[in-house]
Amino acid sequence: MKLLEKEAENIGCKVIHNADLKKYNTFRIGGKAAMLIELASLEACEKLIPLAEKENISYYIFGKGSNLIVDDNGINGVIFHISSDEIKLLDETRVYCAAGVPLSKLCMFALENGLSGLEFAYGIPGSVGGAVYMNAGAYGGEVKDVIESAEAIDTNGNSKRYSVDELEMSYRKSVFSGGKNVIVSAVFKLVKGERSEIKAKMDELMQKRRSKQPLEYPSAGSTFKRPEGSYASLLIEQCGLKGYSVGDAQVSEKHSGFVVNKGNASFDDLMKLICDVKKVIYDKTGYRLECEPEIISDREEYRR
């Protein structure tokens, strides 16, 4: 790990030892990582990820941490934190965006330039890289509707640009899901619109979020993927699990599709609650719920 640290410092990357991972995910749960390295450039990704592979160092990729559940036991390896923030117009309707840019910043950039198409994403608390990775969506819109291409590097440091068809996007999935390729940028194809209309739509959807979602508590957004033929929140309510708690982890009383941290929820609290909900739903309805956030843990049962 010393070699990786030295190389990171040589190319100007910030290195943090014993990084508190609570600060790097929206659930505010998790222990410490042996090392966290800020990847603020394509060069950093191209050099450090292959080196970690070569040195057989375990690592995880973090963006804004809005779709992660992190183990309190911490991580013995390295967290690569994508912090690149470049965003620019390529032409009148196409926007280039680095993977570390917050979705909210991309949405505001589109608004400032009179570009429509990303209104649905305003308020989603993730990064562009994370949004592409899982084909993030809300209120009838998805990343696949507005993305033109994405660039990623593989474990050898080779870069490839993927067309929208090559991204193989479907409900909360892309060609990158479950793999090790690291998204470094994306290009979005938007349409010209009236700024006042774009802002009105963004404000309308933000008001919906605030009225329906438990934004006052830490969470990872929707905790379960939508099962075919139904909705996770509906099944949870029908089975009487709204408000169900394990420690400070709770099925939100405001929106049953969200699990929230009421204060000092532990990783084990959260995982037990999720397992309990999945079991009750299956026993009572036959539906198998799938957890939407990714589990970040060195424990064998959670390793992917």
Residue ranges and their predicted role:
Residues S104, M134-A136, E166-Y171:
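Short acidic (Asp/Glu) patches
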Residues G30, I37-L42, I69-I87, Y133-V164, ...:
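Structural signature of FAD isoalloxazine-binding scaffolds in flavoprotein oxidoreductases
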Residues A110-E148, S219:
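A gly/ser-rich beta-alpha-beta helix-loop segment of oxidoreductase catalytic cores
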Residues I16-H17, I153-C275, K279-V280, K284-R304:
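Phosphate/pyrophosphate- and phosphate-bearing ligand-binding catalytic cores of soluble enzymes
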Residues R28, Y96-A98, E119, G123, ...:
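Conserved beta-strand segments that form the floor/walls of ligand-binding pockets within enzyme
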Residues K2-V128:
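Anion-binding (especially nucleotide phosphate/pyrophosphate-binding) glycine-rich loop
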Residues E55, F62-K64, V146, Y217-P218, ...:
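Short, basic and Ser/Thr-rich N-terminal targeting/leader segments
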